[in-house]
Amino acid sequence: MSSDQTPQNRNRGGDDSYNPRLQQQTSQIPSTGPDQGQQRERSQEQESDHEHQQAQQHLHQFQQSNLTPSTTAFPSSTSIPTFSKQDQGYHNQFSSPQSSYRKIGNFAQSSNAPFLNEPHPIYATNYQQNVPSQSQFQFDYSSPYIGQSQSQSQSQSQAQPQPHPQPQTYQQLPHYSQASVSSLPPTYQAFHSMHEASSADNDSATNITTPQKRKKQKRSESVTPNTGENELKQLALRSSNIPLSELAQKVKQLENDSTTTSVSLEQSKMKENKETQRQLFGMVWLLNSCDLAPTAVIPRNRIYARYVQVCADNNLAPVSPASFGKLVKILYPNITTRRLGMRGQSKYHYCGIKLTGDENMQSQLLNYQQKQKHQSQEQYNQQAQVGSSTSSAGLAGHQSPMSSCNSSVSYEESPGPIISRAHTPSFSPINTPTISMSKSLNDQLPSISHMKFIPNLFYLLNSNVATSSNPHEPIQLPSIYPYLSKDADHDIADTLYSLYKVHVNSIFEALRYMQLKKLFSSFSTFNNILTAPVLKLYTTESLAEWVMKCDLIMYKKMIRMLSKLQLQLLIPQEQLLQLKQIADGYIKTLSTSLINSKVSQNFVMMKLKLAKHFVNLLNRLIKVIETGQPASRILNDDNEKNTMTQDWMKLDIHGIICREMPCNDNNIDTLTYILTGEVVNLIKVKSDNEQAPTMSDFANYISNLPSRFPEVNTRLFLLLASNLLTTCLREISLSGGEGFGAWWIVRCWIDEYLAWSFEVGGFFQDDLQEIVAQQQLNVQLPPPSLSSLPQTQQQNPVIQEETGTQEESLGNIDLLETSFDFDAKTSQPYQQPSHTESLLNFETNIDNLLN
């Protein structure tokens, strides 16, 4: 049989007798005579005989195949039926696509019945009401779609059954009882039982998988996989009397131990213990800060904001909001959570719990906000008065900006408006004719090309001045409330303030203890802990300036801490390599985290601008250390200093100054005295009774040279000093001096150290501008002499002992407490035995420095 003669194709219109639409059309045409009726009967009889033969062939192939289900589909081989014409009529009725394929499609595709893939007749399963008993296979195939003449011809030949055309719409067949199924032949009963079994299996599988998924979700919501909720709750109840500071110290100790542990098993145990201690810290705080109250209602984010604030005060990273909510449910399982508030401004609230002293905290918050507004208004008035008075005084000057001793640090080369924003005036140097106010805080930060000379800069940085950037003091961020909009949520703002404080402290601590992995991962950790409302507030335009101020405070503390390393010439190469890795990967890591967080372009540029300035200063410090190490060996070697002195005495200093340094007579005299007298006295070999200068003496003398020329601009001084040294080295080289190599190494260090001191001065000019103004106007300090420099340097260790409060046990290295150089009051001329003794003391005093 061809594909066009299959029952499916005939039902789709392959034959006119199986097309209901054509049958309806033929019913409207009157009969033309008995000849046409007889021809139609003969064609139907031939067609039914052909189908009967085809069915016999299918059964024969079915019996010969290896997949014959002798025990499943048929009771025995003798029970395979032979189809008569009546059976063929039954087959035609239930083999249409609408009745059979719709109901047993799943069974035909099941792996339990692969023999159904063979081309054999397919039978329906739900057929009880339309099927008579096995002995009655006479069906009435009359249809309302068949015409009158056609129905008369069918009544004359009832033994000739023809298929009944099915309607075009699908109908749900009714469910049949087991009694009606038993009246069917065994073959059909077998097919029905197999279909019912496969359907039951599918239904049971569907019913089983759904509860399992829910159980997995419930397991994932457990607090910890190793410690049960009851054990954690009992541990928190027993630890409720322990101070939070002790718990926080234990968590930080575990965090530091996990960074130094190399074994994977021990590291995993440390991590699990650390997470347990962090959860314990949160639960102890909940027990001490929250009380049960049946009528109390409090916003859920307010409790989390107070918890994050406590973590920030103890310099501890908080858990995520979801994990904190689980801790609340463990301690207080009977409280409920409801969403309350106006439409569009509703929040989730805890019902049945309250914060102790929350009313007093809210009143203090309102008073603090009013105080901040009052202080900002007073600051605006004072800065406006200072700007007007300074601008009027500066107009009386006659010097040019490029010739003054101080330069403007505004990013914009062209002057901006006289007054822009009250809290962002750029620092204006003294004795400049014009005052330019920057448009925003972005312009206030000095770039690499804006430098400033501050007398006794590093002495001031090592003292207690400018506590906001003092690395020994905790980081205090500016208030966030003046930068909030009117409709901002203060609980979310408090959460952001505390989270960012923790973030800034974590970066500073990672650099302090040289934990590079923690430093680079802190950016992504901060982005992951921010919820959607906090992230939205964090990236708003109004808070960009607050974020910039916070980052600027952090970078100032970091540079102030790193400035101690400028003369610590015994720093190990491992730590120097780590500083290089930070300088190389800091910008890349920060930019990647900002791009992944999908913040605005202006926000990204602001963050990267500050980070780039920090990296530039760090690179300059690395160059100072690298050039200072060989320079210190030369300046502490008597033979090298004798050779350098002999070559220097051969130079025509007065001729070089007149040719290379165009300046007035006073500056020529001062410069001649410095090069012919002070430099020679500084590098010549001392007698046994005299104390040789140290590297700190050389550094302080060089950094205070610009104070001898107050009219020269800082950048101009740097260029002229480099040009003068280059000319002197060229003359030494042309004369064949043996000390050319030593002078070249020392000259490289002088260039780097001068640039470093000027860049650091420009970076901290806002913090030290009041002290600089006092020095310039009232109590200007004289340039330190060689005899007074060691006394100045002696005060630094005392200050560090008073302000240093951190424990050295938290890390292998502490940049605040560790010293890599000789003490100034016990410094001796650099010789090989002295160096060996100092290195021995260095390795003895610093525990685990080189792991």
UniProtKB/Swiss-Prot annotation:
Record's compositionally biased regions (Basic and acidic residues): 38-53
The UniProt keywords, alphabetically, are:
DNA damage, DNA-binding, Nucleus, Repressor, Transcription, Transcription regulation, Virulence
Stated induction or repression of this protein's expression: Induced during biofilm formation.
Q: Where in the cell is it found?
A: Nucleus
Give one GO term, molecular function aspect.
DNA-binding transcription activator activity
| Function of the protein | Transcription factor involved in DNA damage responses, morphogenesis, and virulence.
The molecule here is called: Transcriptional regulator RFX1
Q: Which organism is it from?
A: Candida albicans (strain SC5314 / ATCC MYA-2876)
